[in-house]
Amino acid sequence: MAAQKIRIRLKAYDHEVIDSSARKIVETVTRTGAQVAGPVPLPTEKNVYCVIRSPHKYKDSREHFEMRTHKRLIDILDPTPKTVDSLMRLDLPAGVDIEIKL
């Protein structure tokens, strides 16, 4: 039988929030006795929106806004039932999107 692996992918707009969440996950996993690989920083996605400043004309005057999406990847190798239970109970901030693949 192949070794089990849980892959957790985190996304957030604030890099400090995502780093603290990744730190919490790694501490929880190591405390329960499973091995962890990561957090691996994935490329930051940058969306730039260009908006005309004036409501009428003056197309030459524009303003740029950007949204940066930071991503992290954590692999949990050989998870125990205690590991899965503690991950389900873990309380993370609302600004972090979590994707879990088994």
Swiss-Prot record:
Annotated GO MF terms: structural constituent of ribosome; tRNA binding
Alphabetized UniProt keyword annotations: Ribonucleoprotein, Ribosomal protein
GO biological process, one term: translation
SUPFAM superfamilies per the UniProt record, alphabetical: Ribosomal protein S10
Highest taxon of the lineage: Bacteria
Annotated Gene Ontology cellular component terms: ribonucleoprotein complex; ribosome
Pfam families (UniProt xref): Ribosomal_S10
PROSITE patterns: RIBOSOMAL_S10
UniProt KW Ribosomal protein keyword: yes
NCBIfam families according to UniProt: PRK00596.1, rpsJ_bact
Function of the protein: Involved in the binding of tRNA to the ribosomes.
Subunit annotation: Part of the 30S ribosomal subunit.
PANTHER family: 30S RIBOSOMAL PROTEIN S10 FAMILY MEMBER
Name of this chain's protein: Small ribosomal subunit protein uS10
Organism in which the protein naturally occurs: Parafrankia sp. (strain EAN1pec)
Lineage: Bacteria, Bacillati, Actinomycetota, Actinomycetes, Frankiales
Gene name, Swiss-Prot/TrEMBL: rpsJ
